[in-house]
Amino acid sequence: MAGAACEPVARPSLTSISSGELRSLWTCDCELALLPLAQLLRLQPGAFQLSGDQLVVARPGEPAAARGGFNVFGDGLVRLDGQLYRLSSYIKRYVELTNYCDYKDYRETILSKPMLFFINVQTKKDTSKERTYAFLVNTRHPKIRRQIEQGMDMVISSVIGESYRLQFDFQEAVKNFFPPGNEVVNGENLSFAYEFKADALFDFFYWFGLSNSVVKVNGKVLNLSSTSPEKKETIKLFLEKMSEPLIRRSSFSDRKFSVTSRGSIDDVFNCNLSPRSSLTEPLLAELPFPSVLESEETPNQFI
């Protein structure tokens, strides 16, 4: 029994994608996914482009963004094949919110599209061999969406009227995915956080760091790496389905992985929050808080 416990865990296989991971033309059963960034750029040229020293992400209002896309989280820089690129448009991994409108817009935005994070992985035998991966979080999948929504709801319920900080972390899921001998060198990139600063006279718990919470999001990680042309086409279709804008349909089976919120935010704040009519609206451009940075606002250092 001890020997069985020591056996390495098998990595997810692409065979599951071709045999049923794409449930229908409108829904996909994918929680988390990993693929080389270079492969993502080739499969999604409308959403990402390398231009000089910039990694250009489709902005709200552009034709490519109207067809879907991803919410890219980062600190302004990404390292690909040993070269640093500046992100043209992204959501900061840490933001400060000061009122309910900021909170509502932030919540709607991060759940409106799949999340995308950049990580670098090295082999312990040869640290010079580094590969950049794109980590995808399917916010339309009910299991993933539930963890994020419940995390936000629970912290609000426990600190009503007080300031707090909430972080979502995917490091454990990703590190368990890679086999022994591989190391994620910038694991902190696999998290994002927001800090809600309330106008409270005595905010003792916040002052002493007692209102900081961390939600470790878990889920099945799909391996979307492939050199097969046939499977690359399948992966391309898979990514397009995952990131397509929400369209309401008459069939319940087509709506079961809907991105529309079930109203938990209403229960917490007791106010009317209606879902947006379409995810083609420029969500990021409407944000009143400084969460979206342009490429000129590059931080001074990169981890």
UniProtKB/Swiss-Prot annotation:
<keyword id="KW-0963">Cytoplasm</keyword>
<protein>
    <recommendedName>
        <fullName>Mesenteric estrogen-dependent adipogenesis protein</fullName>
    </recommendedName>
</protein>
<dbReference type="GO" id="GO:0045600">
    <property type="term" value="P:positive regulation of fat cell differentiation"/>
</dbReference>
<dbReference type="InterPro" id="IPR043460">
    <property type="entry name" value="MEDAG/TEX26"/>
</dbReference>
<dbReference type="GO" id="GO:0005737">
    <property type="term" value="C:cytoplasm"/>
</dbReference>
<comment type="function">
    <text>Involved in processes that promote adipocyte differentiation, lipid accumulation, and glucose uptake in mature adipocytes.</text>
</comment>
